[in-house]
Amino acid sequence: MKGGNADSWQREKLASMESPEEPGASMDENYFVNYTFKDRSHSGRVAQGIMKLCLEEELFADVTISVEGREFQLHRLVLSAQSCFFRSMFTSNLKEAHNRVIVLQDVSESVFQLLVDYIYHGTVKLRAEELQEIYEVSDMYQLTSLFEECSRFLARTVQVGNCLQVMWLADRHSDPELYTAAKHCAKTHLAQLQNTEEFLHLPHRLLTDIISDGVPCSQNPTEAIEAWINFNKEEREAFAESLRTSLKEIGENVHIYLIGKESSRTHSLAVSLHCAEDDSISVSGQNSLCHQITAACKHGGDLYVVGGSIPRRMWKCNNATVDWEWCAPLPRDRLQHTLVSVPGKDAIYSLGGKTLQDTLSNAVIYYRVGDNVWTETTQLEVAVSGAAGANLNGIIYLLGGEENDLDFFTKPSRLIQCFDTETDKCHVKPYVLPFAGRMHAAVHKDLVFIVAEGDSLVCYNPLLDSFTRLCLPEAWSSAPSLWKIASCNGSIYVFRDRYKKGDANTYKLDPATSAVTVTRGIKVLLTNLQFVLA
């Protein structure tokens, strides 16, 4: 091909490449001519590059923050992007917007260093001795995520020695969740607090809030009120009548429902146990329910149980009248499924389980208590049976149980599945439990306590994706058997069935200190227990 013919061929080829795509043209042909490239790691790489230039190479600093004599070479753009406080400072007509050096008075040098670490890296090591100051300063500088994490940390670690101080702190910063946690600790340990400096200087408003929320009678709230008044009788005598009127005393009974099959009969029982002030347990009553229980949970003041001669049938035990009544049955027969109460939606969820043909199920259905109706929703990621279930802020954590292996034989599961009741979506956590198989779980604040066969008791923090194995007395692991767990009145109760009629162990765990005490006077006429629910 020569001369004009060659030039003509080149022009035709270029024209065909530049012309719009003809109808029916192959996508494969156009792919090699023109396509859009999107670098998915671009934004992260840019952010890392900026932080490296700013911190490691100390380039482009345009503001100096002086704290207790130490100067921090920082960047207005980075500070403004993370903190509304600094954004307002640098964009206002105040002198700080134009000054090269800014002096901060309300924060210590060590805590400000932690704030800088958080602003630039998104990571900060929270230490108990500095936690309250970080909490206050992060609120002042409007670092919302850090403030909320400090609040959760304080709520988990609140104890007798700091509960009143934390309560003051939460009140000043309008933090209702932390305030409630601190107030609960204060009212349940009032007898220990009544002669402390923090209690004697407590404002009248906060004292009223504590005693009106229901103080256990064993804490002698009347004596605490008298001690507070007598500390400054001249000024506080006028509050005496209003405080006594506001006082609400409550008993300390913990209701734990044990559902299981009594060895000498063919029916199952529901027994309400009462843990009294001295931690002795007595049985209050029992109601018969035919055949084997398949699942159970407590919703509001009532106990819901699935089972009987027809496995899909559900019963409700009214806690006030101690009467059983039928509810709407499940759409299909299911065994070894998990019932979880979700009070925020006034619903009870049934997750996983087995069919009567012994096939694992990934079905999720929920029961609308007010309407007495079951509704099907999206499925679990992995079919499981016999898993533990715990509701935490509308997210159901389905833990362990049994799943299918590659050959469709069942095996003990270590999976953590999260079902969001707001979006009806399920996902599996990228990490697994420290043990596998059947287990039971209870929620305390934003933690999930998990108990399994043998000596395994673990505290799971879903926010930090962490597990903490708790140390317990030697008696705990003396004979492996299945434990049950319940959360009530700020404590964790763990029940162990020894499979001997009339003989059982119950432990009471203080989540704040991890201290374990053994309850006394236990005589339970049940074996092969299905659930323990508080």
UniProtKB/Swiss-Prot annotation:
Keyword Transferase: no
Subunit composition and interactions: Component of the BCR(KBTBD4) E3 ubiquitin ligase complex, at least composed of CUL3, KBTBD4 and RBX1.
Protein name: Kelch repeat and BTB domain-containing protein 4
Keywords: Kelch repeat, Repeat
Pfam family membership, one: Kelch_2
Primary gene name: KBTBD4
Region: Disordered, residue numbers: 1-25
Record bears the keyword Plastid: no
Signal sequence, renumbered to the chain: none
Annotated function: Substrate-specific adapter of a BCR (BTB-CUL3-RBX1) E3 ubiquitin ligase complex which targets CoREST corepressor complex components RCOR1, KDM1A/LSD1 and HDAC2 for proteasomal degradation. RCOR1 is likely to be the primary target while degradation of KDM1A and HDAC2 is likely due to their association with RCOR1. Also targets RCOR3, MIER2 and MIER3 for proteasomal degradation as well as associated proteins ZNF217 and RREB1. Degradation is dependent on the presence of an ELM2 domain in the target proteins.
Kelch repeat copies, ranges: 255-301, 302-344, 347-394, 396-446, 448-497
Note: As part of a BCR (BTB-CUL3-RBX1) E3 ubiquitin ligase complex, mediates the effects of the small molecule UM171 in enhancing hematopoietic stem and progenitor cell expansion ex vivo by specifically targeting the CoREST repressor complex for proteasomal degradation.
InterPro entries referenced in this protein's UniProt entry, alphabetically: BACK, BTB-kelch_protein, BTB/POZ_dom, KBTBD4, KBTBD4_BACK, KBTBD4_BTB_POZ, Kelch-typ_b-propeller, Kelch_2
Domain BACK: 163-255
SUPFAM superfamilies found in the cross-reference section: Kelch motif, POZ domain
Sequence ranges assigned to domain BTB in this UniProt record: 61-128
